[in-house]
Amino acid sequence: MESIMNNIVAERAAALGCTVIDEALLKNYTTFKVGGKCGMIRLNSAASCGELVNLMNELGEEFIVLGKGSNVIADDNGTEKIVLLIGDEMSDIDIEDDIIRCGAGASLTAVCRAALKAELTGLEFAYGIPGSVGGGVYMNAGAYGGEIKDIILYAEAVSRSDGSVRRFSPEEMELSYRHSRFMQDDHIIT
């Protein structure tokens, strides 16, 4: 059987310490439990994301980005595009001086629990929102009168065009009701 994923990309991803899954089933990565086969790379850092994005651009390989897979309906026929998964490997949560810093793969619920344990307030609205921090920033998630835009200090993202990492201020993210610049932008929240 022929491999779904470009071998050059798979080898580079493995060398960077990412997990390569040649025939992942998207249904195992979406909350609706739908989706067919794909070549998947479980990213482990913004740096590996940037390097792989650069390589895929050079090779003309198309890719899509997936977090916790909430609000995603994937085709049961799968995709030929490489799926870059921002998952548990990018879900660290650190708290210092009343500031929570976390990876885009962290679940919103896990960040809320960490805030509660550290006796921090402001994230109560996000408890129970399915999905990741990256997805929450991407669509300015909110509930019960609170939104991500009310609490975020900055977001780091990788450029889809050149793989560089950039930090965005709340103003630069253009956060509004269920919207951010990332919906029309060429950056991957990390």
Labelled PLM ranges:
Residues 172-182:
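Flexible, small-/acidic-enriched active-site or ligand-binding loops
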Residues 4-133:
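Anion-binding (especially nucleotide phosphate/pyrophosphate-binding) glycine-rich loop
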Residues 35, 39-47, 73-91, 138-169, ...:
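Structural signature of FAD isoalloxazine-binding scaffolds in flavoprotein oxidoreductases
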Residues 121, 151, 171-173:
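Short beta-strand or tight-loop elements
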